[in-house]
Amino acid sequence: MEAVKETELVHRYDPAYDTTGITNEIALDGFALSDLELLGIGGFTPLTGFLNEDDYHSVVKSMRLANGAPWSIPISLPVSADQASALRVGERAKLVYKNDIYGVIEIESIYTPDKKVEAQEVYRTTDEAHPGVAKMYARPPIYVGGPIVLTKRVNYERFASYYIDPIDTRRIFAEKGWKTVVGFQTRNPVHRAHEYIQKAALETVDGLFLNPLVGETKAGDIPADVRMESYEVLLKNYYPKNRVHLSVFPAAMRYAGPREAIFHALVRKNYGCTHFIVGRDHAGVGNYYGTYDAQEIFKEFEEGELGIKPLFFEHSFYCKACGNMASQKTCPHDSEHHVILSGTKVRQMLKEGVLPPQEFSRKEVVEVLMRG
């Protein structure tokens, strides 16, 4: 497969930036802090800051920035009415989390979004039972937009060696001689269906970038440290060492389904991927999205416009009659022979203390999950 041309990364990290004399302060929540860091290190290229009003409305309505560049998820900085009343367009404000300054924003816009419209357009629902919608509604009501400078990095104590910036993953891929790299996004332990599609993709490209999300997720999702250990044992025992790279994606999960699939692809392009795996119900939750909505949405962009090629995979399963993993494209047997795998099912089994069978997960992975 041919490589896709790399885009230049935005770089907004400056630890020497002088914040003295800036009196305005904006308190960040954990969600905004992870967004700030990704803006600073180029993970959200082409964004240079939290969306101003024009870009916000354009992204919500058309999945593009005001200049036409593809971008599907609004990266917003919410503030309370009290905080907003002290801020002025044209001024700078320190971005503070738990009394530490992590950055500065140059304020271009202060605006009140219609969150119902945002929910319907971005999440395709206004239902407050949807975790992404609930999170958005619970955050403050006014948005502040403008370019940022990241002045302090977040200190990640857990699995620190797996936090690798886009500029460094690009270098690592180049050093490995990978011209084509496929990215895989997950918030679940890797089960046999994931392994099947990852290895199918790996047949056609030089390298696999396993990039699990370790930012904020919903209650009930398996903790990141347990997941990381499960990835380590899987890669060690079942993947070729020179063809796989594992590092984490420090973003919060939005559960925005199709729009988040576009977002995840654009971000992995920044990390150096040329291809991106989109399976069934990517970034979905509950029954809010159709099985392949996250694949269909890519048709809304011209070929080549995203700068990364999506690889679409159908629902895969373990077929007892075939004796291996398969999909509708490769298996002739009826569904009674199929063991349907999903992260939800694995989580449910673990919760009930039931050992997931060999068809679901590798033995080494199951041992880690049961301990966790």
From Swiss-Prot:
Keywords, sorted A to Z: ATP-binding, Nucleotide-binding, Nucleotidyltransferase, Transferase
Oxidoreductase listed as a keyword: no
Top-level taxon: Bacteria
InterPro entries listed in its UniProt record: ATP-Sase_PUA-like_dom, PUA-like_sf, Rossmann-like_a/b/a_fold, SO4_adenylyltransferase_pro, Sulfurylase_cat_dom, Sulphate_adenylyltransferase
Gene Ontology biological process: hydrogen sulfide biosynthetic process; sulfate assimilation
Catalysed reactions, as listed in the record: sulfate + ATP + H(+) = adenosine 5'-phosphosulfate + diphosphate
Enzyme Commission no: 2.7.7.4
Matching Pfam families: ATP-sulfurylase, PUA_2
Pathway it works in: Sulfur metabolism; hydrogen sulfide biosynthesis; sulfite from sulfate: step 1/3
GO MF annotations, alphabetized: ATP binding; sulfate adenylyltransferase (ATP) activity
Family to which this protein belongs: Belongs to the sulfate adenylyltransferase family.
Protein name from the UniProt record: Sulfate adenylyltransferase
Lineage: Bacteria, Bacillati, Bacillota, Bacilli, Bacillales
Record gene name: sat
